Swiss-Prot record:
Swiss-Prot/TrEMBL domain comment: The Asp-Asp-Xaa-Xaa-Asp/Glu (DDXXD/E) motif is important for the catalytic activity, presumably through binding to Mg(2+).
EC number annotated for this UniProt entry: 4.2.3.23
Catalytic activity annotation: (2E,6E)-farnesyl diphosphate = (+)-(R)-germacrene A + diphosphate
Residues at which Mg(2+) 3 binds: 477, 481, 485
GO MF terms held by the record: germacrene-A synthase activity; magnesium ion binding
Domain of life, per lineage: Eukaryota
Main function: Involved in sesquiterpene lactone biosynthesis. Produces exclusively (+)-germacrene A.
Cofactor(s) needed by this chain: Mg(2+)
UniProt-recorded name of the protein: Germacrene A synthase long form
Source species of the chain: Cichorium intybus
Amino acid sequence: MALVRNNSSNGREPVLSPRSLTSPRGLTSPRPLSVQPTPEPVRPLANFPPSIWADRFISFSLDNSQLEAYANALEEPKEAVKSLITDTTIDANTKLKLIYSVHRLGLSYLYPDEIDAELNKLFEKIDLQYYEQVDLYTIAVQFQVFRHHGYKISSDVFKKFKDSTTGTFTDDVTKDVKGMLSLYESAHLRLHGEDILDEALAFTEAHLKKILTTLEGDLARQVNQVLKRPFHTGMPMVEARLYFITHEEDFSSHESVVKLAKVHFNYLQLQQKEELRLVSQWWKDMQFQQSVPYIRDRVPEIYLWILGLYFEPYYSRARIIATKITLFLVVLDDTYDAYATIDEIRSITDAINRWEISAIDQLPEYIKPFYRILLNEYDDLEKEYSKDGRAFSVHASKQAFQEIARGYLEEAEWLHNGYVATFPEYMKNGLITSAYNVISKSALVGMGAIADEEALAWYETHPKILKASELISRLQDDVMTFQFERKRGQSATGVDAYIKEYNVSEEVAIKELMKMIENAWKDINEGCLKPTEVSVALLTPILNLARMIDVVYKFDDGFTFPGKTLKDYITLLFVSPPPSLEN
């Protein structure tokens, strides 16, 4: 239903009361002034679809005793799996397949030191000669294990599967569906200059699509699932659940792995449903749907997005903080894009830059509650984190929020003036308005000691991996939303700017932007290889933020219209029961 506001833009009808005007000589009073109400400004309403979840997640009630029971139940299988990982009697192939399954099931964070120690030993022993004796599936699995954990295993391990005469992959590869599927997964970990993996990606994708209709059972589901979204570009929690469902034969021989995965899924679902309840209740209490009803009401979707950055139990507080700040961003973005006039946008931007409660007087009435809540939340965070000397992280998040407000204003001025920016101009501002900087900085706030001032200083240098993830955030969004934005008459996206800058067709522009995204993924892959500049714990949210952009925007604007991918993901993680512990 269209969101139509009959009140004036500042929430109050301008009223002028006629005064009794009497002439100084006592003559008859003049006629009362005819007062015309100030017309409601034309607003760029987007009529966003309403939430598909309403208050569903508020009703959840956490059973703390059950959560504690799951925590206790984790200990036995956790120790058993640790013993498997460190078992010196297990051969290299079995050990690497075990680590592969542990990683795919989202359990590797439980054993960072043990896995690293084992991979160090194995990486030193294994060479190209060893791989001459191994099949494609095994090689591809081991390639993924090493690359996912930062080891630069050579892509030359796949050379033996190419025809020396034609230079293409052999027919034998097409007959090995599991091997081909694993090679396809491996190709997404490619670096710049790894032509063999570029070729492998195109080759395996074409052949897997060709044979998909001939496959049955789990193998058909595996191929369909991976063609839709490879593990490397997926949301870790969702990929773990899907792997458990469709790849049980990979790990079913290890009873302790199966048990650990089941208990882990049950524990995480309880914890995460409670977090979702907390942010949903907070959102309702803040009454944003009453004060700013034109915005996208997307609490579960934003929580899912942040969960995609880090799902580990010890980041619970971090997720709640980052979810709230990202919801603030949604309010700001939709206010600038889908409601405020240019004069109101200028006033709001100025107030956010001033960041003081006295600035509220200059704001239109409808946005005042938001501004007050925004300042209060940040003030509470600053007090909370000043106690352990971490207020610097809150300041960084606040500065990023102020920066994005200025970026949104820049876009609004372009639209107001009918200006289509050059592509370099667009990208400079577009990387800011992608919201990447705000989300990534806000994600640091609750991460604890690992996200210290040195880590923040590294962020501020804008390293290549950060730039790459940021670029993906901007361009993947643009490619999927530019038509919707055009229809609404909104500011030009990267697609429009590229068309204008290089005088090319829409098709060519999209193709070139997708190439830029592809190269950015290679930069991310390189940035995750050892030796890394900072802790892997800091790199992982950067990688995962790029993954979540792919999840949300690969096929459509999944955030504005969340009834497809995000609905399925939310259902899987927070509605459907996790694997039963009874069997």
